[in-house]
Amino acid sequence: MEFSVKSGSPEKQRSACIVVGVFEPRRLSPIAEQLDKISDGYISALLRRGELEGKPGQTLLLHHVPNVLSERILLIGCGKERELDERQYKQVIQKTINTLNDTGSMEAVCFLTELHVKGRNNYWKVRQAVETAKETLYSFDQLKTNKSEPRRPLRKMVFNVPTRRELTSGERAIQHGLAIAAGIKAAKDLGNMPPNICNAAYLASQARQLADSYSKNVITRVIGEQQMRELGMNAYLAVGHGSQNESLMSVIEYKGNPSEDARPIVLVGKGLTFDSGGISIKPSEGMDEMKYDMCGAAAVYGVMRMVAELQLPINVIGVLAGCENMPGGRAYRPGDVLTTMSGQTVEVLNTDAEGRLVLCDVLTYVERFEPEAVIDVATLTGACVIALGHHITGLMSNHNPLAHELIGASEQAGDRAWRLPLGDEFQEQLESNFADMANIGGRPGGAITAGCFLSRFTRKYNWAHLDIAGTAWRSGKAKGATGRPVALLSQFLLNRAGFNGEE
């Protein structure tokens, strides 16, 4: 679908459809009032007759409104004006896209971007409208043989801004929104792929294709098991021992700042393409969803695509830590003691706490890049789901400014994260009689003790950990990958690049 931005009066629009908002109770938005005045009270008369209350999700399609050039006007219920927040705004946009497609509109001029959303400017409203529209239209049917093409006649959406001064920021919002939406789609597509197709080799092939598509700024290197052995990445290797699929670490380097002093931001994504739990095997119910245990790597891939598409003037390295955790005669066992790349030893108490074993070696590996900051993204703990549910990502960090940056970016992007503590009292839960540490610390504070484990491998740089176990995918009827936290990390990097969305 094509997006553009313009500044114009609603009565002069010759588009097939104009979209305006109505608040509860039967209150016209300012743009709707203009149309009502031009039409000699035609719209307000319909509302007085009870045709539309203005509740969220309500719609009314008007044809051939007097004195209006557009063929149709779509009225969208926006709820109470004072309660229009970010979440409600996105829901209104989603309803708009679905209704326009259902009614056969091929193009529309949307004035919803002129609604007042507390604390949000036109850039934010246009960008979120683009991202939400793309999210609404997403489907994953690559593997279906009988594809039923959904009815989607909508081809062009124009967002209106109040004055010509906002056109530049509106165009930039569309550019950013499309790049972020493409990154989210890429992450969702990877996440939704079945594990018999999407293994570590598949992740590596996608990383190589990204470098081919953006060869000017991107190079990809793939590190296999032989090189991992030479590097001493024994914890990473142990996790993949039970699988017939080779563990592969894909390193995607984007260089947008040629200065020798420009240190990179490193993103590390957990890429367990299937996690059976290993010898500490998981219950069979819901095990199919363990294909989503690579959503951290998928998110990092999506963010790297966004960075390359927008050619941000910063240096970013994305690492996809591809691996598969399976039981078998060669699988690692509870009771094993592993020597990590850092030299620290780990007693394995549970082979289903494998993500941290993969990540700890990758976090040691990335020291060589002398990073400005390192952010790992992982579907790490069920404990984080218990703590924060399926709406908020868990955040831990050894650096307060970095944590504050990420929280701020999460609020800007509408991809929320919440900071959890890292304290010495939690570190004590990882003590082992036989090694430097155990790979689990018991049930209490499980998300935090996982973060504490990782923190022992990040002492040489500023680091943050995003636990996306609750936010990376949905179960039930709407089952599928969400693409989070691509939006959060994209906003963080846009801010670092100087594009913070302020007009």
Swiss-Prot record:
Molecular-function GO terms, alphabetical: aminopeptidase activity; manganese ion binding; metalloaminopeptidase activity
Reaction catalyzed: Release of an N-terminal amino acid, Xaa-|-Yaa-, in which Xaa is preferably Leu, but may be other amino acids including Pro although not Arg or Lys, and Yaa may be Pro. Amino acid amides and methyl esters are also readily hydrolyzed, but rates on arylamides are exceedingly low; Release of an N-terminal amino acid, preferentially leucine, but not glutamic or aspartic acids
Active site (UniProt): K282, R356
Subcellular location: Cytoplasm
Gene name for this UniProt entry: pepA
Protein name, per record: Probable cytosol aminopeptidase
Residues annotated for Mn(2+) 1 binding in this entry: D275, D352, E354
Keyword Calcium: no
Native species: Salmonella typhimurium (strain LT2 / SGSC1412 / ATCC 700720)
Listed PANTHER family: CYTOSOL AMINOPEPTIDASE, LEUCINE AMINOPEPTIDASE-RELATED
Keywords, sorted A to Z: Aminopeptidase, Cytoplasm, Hydrolase, Manganese, Metal-binding, Protease
